[in-house]
UniProtKB/Swiss-Prot annotation:
This is Plant-type L-asparaginase. The active site is at residue 175. The lineage of its organism: Archaea, Methanobacteriati, Methanobacteriota, Thermococci, Thermococcales. Keywords: Autocatalytic cleavage, Hydrolase, Protease. GO terms for cellular component: cytoplasm. GO terms for biological process: proteolysis. Signal peptide: none annotated. The record marks 174-175 as: Cleavage. It comes from Pyrococcus horikoshii (strain ATCC 700860 / DSM 12428 / JCM 9974 / NBRC 100139 / OT-3). It comes from the Archaea. One of its GO terms (molecular function) is asparaginase activity. It catalyses: L-asparagine + H2O = L-aspartate + NH4(+).
């Protein structure tokens, strides 16, 4: 039983007219991933699905990543193989089109797991990734609007981030991710531009193995939402532990989000999972989380928010 699931991020989609575009985006990604999965590689499926999401400016990853407090882009990404526990990640990278592909190169071409900032950019250039500007006009306008609110005192920037997000849900934007099982191996991957108005140098859960991204021989998980929550709970690894204890992917997803809600409240997290039986799971405590999945026996993806 093979399966793949993708997400386009947890949070609140303020403009209802964006929802069909978001659903179409995750469906497109899962179809591309499914085609790769049918060729036999969960690793290729996860990378290619996430690249589709990174290239779609409606999502907060790659092209269309949100801006830091000083108006720049700093992106995070990670990918992990469940069979070997190999992993690669980049944090605070800029000037590349597909951070997930750079993360894969970290996994395959180095002895390291995580490269950050200028080091990640230099590595990307060594690997042949060309200079690319992922900033879009829409993100610039959103940044200007939020920065104006900040300057007027409407947003108290030094408040706890969770409180800020409750008042201004537009600050929290969508991470993207994918998890796949090819019949032999589970692979998980995640990519994000982070949180709007984040401090320069801030790193979320996405590139932290075990927090936002994790895979082993029993399950894989990709998290989305307020990264600091996933880091404190080691949420992706915790979710796979639930599977090891006997839950399927859906029950483990529910348990992971219940844990996040218990400690940090609602409107904080979402998760997607696949287990080694080919079951998919997804859960959230936010208003929305776009997702799409396909598995054996399905001709069209199941998708929603």
């Amino acid at each position: 039983m093979v399966a793949i699931i993708v997400h386009g991020g947890a949070g609140t989609i303020k403009k209802e007219e964006r929802i069909p575009k978001v659903i179409e985006g995750v469906k497109e990604a899962v179809i591309v991933g499914w085609k790769e999965l049918r060729k036999g590689s969960a690793l290729d499926a996860v990378e290619e699905a996430i690249k589709v999401l990174e290239d779609n400016p409606i999502f907060n990853a790659g092209t269309g990543s949100v801006l830091t407090i000083d108006g720049k882009v700093e992106m995070d990404a990670a990918i992990m193989r469940g069979k070997t526990l190999e992993a690669g990640a980049v944090a605070g990278i800029w000037g590349v089109k597909n951070p997930i592909s750079v993360a894969r190169k970290v996994m395959e071409k180095t002895d390291h797991v995580l490269l950050v900032g200028e080091g990640a950019v230099k590595f990307a250039r060594l690997m042949g990734f060309p200079e690319y500007n992922p900033i879009t006009e829409e993100r610039i306008e959103q940044w200007k609007e939020l920065k104006e609110k900040l300057m007027k005192g409407e947003i108290k920037y030094w408040k706890k981030l969770g409180e800020l997000i409750k008042e201004y849900p537009e600050v929290l934007r969508s991470t993207v991710g994918a998890v796949a099982f090819d019949g032999e191996e589970i692979v998980a991957g995640t990519s994000t531009g982070g949180v709007f108005l984040k401090m320069f140098g801030r790193v979320g859960d996405t590139p932290i193995i075990g927090a936002g991204t994790y895979a082993n021989e029993v399950a894989g998980a990709s998290c989305t939402g307020l990264g600091e929550v996933a880091i404190r709970l080691a949420l992706a690894k915790t979710a796979t532990d639930f599977v090891r204890l006997g839950m399927d992917a859906q029950a483990a997803s529910n348990a992971a989000i219940s844990l996040a809600t218990k400690y940090f409240g609602k409107d904080t997290m979402g998760i997607i999972m696949v287990d080694a039986a080919g079951n998919v799971g997804f859960a959230k405590n936010t208003k929305h989380m776009s997702y799409a999945y396909m598995k054996d026996g399905m001709e069209e993806p199941e998708a929603g928010v």
